[in-house]
């Protein structure tokens, strides 16, 4: 890396100003709360995270693959937040903002050290700090993973520059360690070996310019050597990819989107590359979710995108003297590969958060190109300074406004509905927000619209079924739960739909069918205690007391529950096992001393009195 000193007073002042700019832009996040899109799975309803930083929680973090990812460091960072701030969202937002500010400063010093250009580096870092596309990563607590993996990525780039100055095993090991930590925060950093090859080309200059036949031959020889140098890092990437595929297979995340043909996915990927560039230049109408067009995308769009992408790629190859062009362009294209949608994960066409690091390639191209093409401009410093200031004010104002939309689930998804058509995710989550405030009547309309806009969206059918069941419209609710089972993406959602369908069937006194539904729920989620209890109740009604006792015992072992233990006692009574019934009643009373029915039956058994008659001898 360049020998310029990065600890001089000017650099420190610039870094401080970058932090101030970042804090000023994102200050509204401190008044934002949690939202009902992934924040429940990551924080608000995750009982491991809610315990704070514990040994059992950290052990769980290293083996957990929920939320379709393996990212133990992300889990641990959320646990640290709960340990420090409990469930105060301002504290969680403060941690995310700290990481983003840290990334901004790291980026500035990284570019400064690598290129020696102070003001160019500062401008790239400043736009990165306030660009509205990055709001999603900063304002969304669930996107801690993007911030954290980027921190380790930038640290790995610093370590790589240190290694390049004096190659050695210890220095390379530090690069590998930081890369591994980044992968343990979010697997999107999987492209780091490719990114390091780009840094070898520019700005590190480890590859010769392929301008002559002799130079091209040397270029390929050197490129092969540098690629082999990255082999240990590539092995880490492959290991991370394997773990990620396993995690997503367990939640059915990839398989659920296999109905999208490869041509459809490629068309959307090409168009998304162009849309990210459009939003980089004109970042308006941003939303938390952009519905996938599936097979409705006009053919001219991917064709136009492919043409423009090829033209600019050809332009970069024709201007190899400006190495930053090809390096920045390939950085943008390459870093988006894991999330561009060729392997479709999730239902989105694209996502703002995916541009967090790929956007850097475009920023470098723009800033370096403007600087290189304006040396003879009259009053160059004043003009470039004014243009830079206006750009930062523009982006910062838009980012602050976008941050305000993240205040709560209502503002977030109402805005998404305003700027994106047929946004079935926004409709569904807005409905969930109304459920949380006790307005199922308003939620109903949003769930219904979600199912109309996306008939194959299982979660909306499930939520609609819950509302209908609450209105005692059991037949309609049952149909919605069946749709949720048919179209559900994740095992947990499908298991819950089976469970609720069983409850509806119980209300209709269809005992055998209900029993089958609860059994399916347990098959999908063997640790779902409520389904064991529901199946036990059904078996008790059908006089299968041995099976009922087994299910009540299983449910109570998963989550100690006085009601489950009481009915375990009743089942054992029916089997003539009074000693076992006594044990169950005592355990129930230990959990709930005022459980009168358990106390009454326990006293009758102990005293030898006739057992009291229950008017309804079933759950």
Where are these regions (language model features)?
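Terminal, low-structured helical/coil segments at or just beyond the last alpha-helical repeat
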Residues: 574, 582-586, 590-619
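Canonical positions in the second alpha-helix
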Residues: 416, 449-450, 483-487, 520-521, ...
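Polytopic membrane enzymes that build or remodel cell-surface glycoconjugates and lipids
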Residues: 1-472, 476, 486, 493, ...
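Conserved alpha-helical positions within TPR/SEL1-like repeat arrays
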Residues: 425-436, 459-470, 496-507, 530-540, ...
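Structural marker of alpha-solenoid helical repeat scaffolds
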Residues: 419, 453, 487-490, 524, ...
